Amino acid sequence: KIDVLAARYLTNTKITCKYLTVELKKDEAEKSTINQILKYVDWVCTEYAYGDYEMIEACIIAAGYEEGMDRYYREVVQRHYTQGSHPVRNKQWNDLKLLKYTCVDGEIVYEDVTPPLR
């Protein structure tokens, strides 16, 4: 099950403009965690975002990440899709952030460790 699924609405409306999917791991995230959240992203895209990946942001928050996660992230994170009909626009989604958390002096500190796609 999705740990966190949030929706952002256009100001003063009930129209959804973005969805945020978050997977939380108290320890180290494994490569399978990326697969897990990408399944959630695909499901949200189909069920809520009308096939528009641009409406979705995703994030994994973990205490650390398994060795080799950078390379695996680059291999699997991108989603290719088509938008519109006249003209058709080919798009690419890769809006998955990897955040590492630590506790410093009783405060939770987040560091963005998302690998660049190059």
Residue ranges and their predicted role:
Residues 1-118:
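Charged, terminal alpha-helix-loop-beta segments
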